[in-house]
């Protein structure tokens, strides 16, 4: 699995492959990954990538037992929030503005950061 070194997300992907951070996913999230990937590549390759992600030691498969429904503008985004809460994740990395509502919710507290902020955290290690 490769991402071009010219791609803005290259460092994020390489850091993932090197085990520099944990990725928490649920079955719903994995299904979305496969769906999004298959828009640009074949369904079989998308499935392979999802399988390869699952094989990494720095992936935590989470089965959220509660749906918080904190994002009303795009309820489909809640799968990421529910997973993050269940995993006790430090933050969600996203560029999706629907997640901004999480900054105003005192409980449960879910941190959100942009990809650029995440890249800064990776570089400061």
Please place each PLM-identified region on the residue numbering.
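Conserved beta-strand segments of alpha/beta enzyme cores
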Residues: 22, 58-60, 111
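Short, well-structured N-terminal submotif of metal-dependent ribonuclease cores
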Residues: 1-25
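Acidic, PIN/NYN-like endoribonuclease modules and their adjacent C-terminal/linker elements
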Residues: 71, 97-125
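Active-site neighborhoods of divalent-metal-dependent phosphate/nucleic-acid chemistry enzymes
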Residues: 58-92, 97, 101
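Residues at the C-termini of beta-strands that transition into short coil/loop
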Residues: 27, 65, 116
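Hydrophobic/aromatic ligand-binding patch that stacks against planar heteroaromatic rings
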Residues: 15, 53, 83, 104
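Glycine/small-residue-rich phosphate/adenosyl-binding loop
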Residues: 26-28, 33, 38, 47
């Amino acid at each position: 699995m490769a991402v071009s070194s010219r791609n803005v997300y290259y460092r994020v992907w390489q850091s993932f492959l090197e085990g520099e951070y944990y990725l928490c996913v649920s079955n719903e999230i994995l299904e979305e990954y496969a769906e999004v990937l298959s828009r640009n590549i074949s369904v079989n390759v998308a499935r392979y990538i999802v399988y390869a992600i699952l094989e990494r030691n720095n992936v935590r498969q989470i089965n959220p037992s509660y749906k918080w429904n904190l994002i009303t503008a795009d309820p489909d985004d809640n799968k990421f929030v529910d997973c993050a809460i269940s995993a006790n994740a430090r933050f969600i990395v996203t560029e999706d503005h629907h997640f901004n509502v999480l900054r105003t919710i005192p409980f449960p507290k879910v941190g959100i950061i942009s990809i650029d902020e995440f890249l800064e955290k990776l570089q400061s290690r």
